[in-house]
Amino acid sequence: MRLGLIKEDAVLDQNEAFILCDSNGAEQIRLISIIDNGGSALAYKAIRNKNGSSSVCIVKEYYPAQKEDIYKRNKVGEPIFISKNKEKELKIQQENIERELSANQAVYFSVNYDESNSPYVYHSELFTHFGDSSYIVMDTNEGNTLYTVMRKTLTPEKCLRYIYQLLVIVNHLNNKGYLHGDIKPQNIWIRGENENQSMLLLDFGTAMHLSDFQVDVSKLSVDEIFEAADRMKENESLGSMTENFGSLGILSIRNHKKMYRTTDQSYERALALIEAVNNLSVADDLYSVVKVAGELFEKAIMSQEQRDSIEEVLQDMKEKNQTTGYHSVAELREDIEVIECILNNGAHPAVLEKNFLKSRLLTLPDDFTEELLCDVE
């Protein structure tokens, strides 16, 4: 946990409960435990008390990791204060919150904003401002993050079910034109029990609608190209996706933003940054899904033959992730189905071949090499 902020044991201490109230004092939220320490916020599991009833929720407290030297809190329960560049920081904070809530509403509600909302996302809203920080609340049901679930015993079948559910969610976001940007076990919520379990995505802090940033340079003047590159350079969400760091698209953006920030802000560098942003796609979320799949199967209990076979497939998937990437949900699903086939029918063909070759190897006597050298002489 960061120096100067809340210590985890203090949050869990019943005598030092950290409680938030809304502006009217009618609603109260008690923070229970920290579930993630992300790039721009702390996420807490909390209890929301409203109209005499209590419910589980997730609360995000804005606190950017890269600026922790200027975001301070003296002790538990006190507000965060910004020690310098306060006006600028609050403006950035407000922009980030508006972007996150806008993305959440776009993927949560149906087109007509009726009661037919998404089964894959929780509704988020601004709860309150407290000191120099803002708090977003996500309504949830009883459950845990996938990160917590992974501490328990996992069967390979349950791992498969989680991955398939995650692919459905990514496909849902992709169909709406969104990239989540931070898919990881801490941002995946599991509710329900056994066959009734379902999965939802948390935290849209780095989510983006691709059309909001991708531009057609053929329709822009030189000045407009520089203006577009400047907007991309200043936008914190572009290239900051923590779990997607390493994907081809995110690496390209980070590199081109870094080059464009130098004093040599040439036309060519502006074009290169715009092109990198234009190349963002569902592949960058699928990159994270492959990482989650690897973590899940690493924790699963299975036979050694199954583990060897699945690791063979996962290794191929990781190599593809680092080279060409996966460009559609269907493409990644095909490789996951190979793992399902292994679990249902036995070992992967590559593992069977290796075992066959091992069984065909001859055991040579220790003095075989010496005898061979003598024969040559």
Regions inferred by a protein language model and the residue ranges of each:
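Short beta-strand micro-motifs within the conserved protein kinase catalytic domain, predominantly
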Residues: N112-S134
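Regulatory extensions appended to serine/threonine kinase catalytic cores
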Residues: N344-E377
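Activation segment signature within eukaryotic-like protein kinase domains
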Residues: Y162-I163
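Activation segment/activation loop of eukaryotic-type protein kinase catalytic domains
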Residues: G192-R254, K258
